Amino acid sequence: MSDLKTVWFGMLTDDSDDSGTDSSIVLIINVRGGRFDVLHRTFPDTNQNDQEQGQANLYEITEDDFEPQPFVGSTVDPQDLNASSIRIGIRGDDMWRPKSIFIWGEQKDGLIVPLALNTELQGDVGIAGQLVGVALSTDSGEGKLSFAPARVQLGDQTVVIKRLLMLLTTADVDNAGTDGDIALQITATDGRVVVDHVFPDTSQDDLERAQANLYFAPVDIPFTRGELNADSIRLSIKGDDAWVPARLFLFGLSEPEGGQPPEFVVPLVHLPTWSLGTLSTDEREGQGSVVLPLLDNIVLL
């Protein structure tokens, strides 16, 4: 058992008309129905396209953002959270429609812990009780004030991965963004290429300076983390327009697109600070591809 050191909040706003908002979004964490919240974080404006239609955002919450606790230096132990401990709310009547939400944390012992995930909040049918048609607003005629995202569990090395979730931000420096495509390839230890995916253009500001992106990727052959080694995961760029990431995270999901809501999330790559250099097929500017380090602090059961 260990308290959280950092919480990450990734989101994608729906691409339908009037889905974006100028109202502030708030993340609330409460432990087992306690009388006081342990986290009540209202997100300020950033250099990202905050909650704009069709855009992704990625925010970091640190220890300093948590409410003071009875024990100095403590935040919250993920094992103390229940199905309604985490809520996402809005501070204004400008309605917001989120499409996808992912919240995870890093414990003080270094373990990466998935906390909540909704892959599709605007679908027509809620599978297995999944929320659909979520809209937030302080105007009760437009939406709800808050909702509880679906809790997920940390997957171990035996969980079969059927879909991928990648979140990233591009550096906020001159010429960091790119118009080039990036690709992800994952090769199992037996030589099988289980993922070979080029990320297409989306409604997001793809790989643009200071912007966040949230992408799902299909899995060609289901696999487990136990079938990977240090050289299994490779990220490449398909052109000479250089790209400089700021951070990148990759997770495996236990269910494919259109299936049941994922129960397990397997952390694969966790780079809160990108240190692998510039990507470009022009060797004068960077490397055409890099091996992404496989996260080694997964729980081995």
Stretches with model-predicted labels:
Residues 1-301:
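Regulatory, non-catalytic segments
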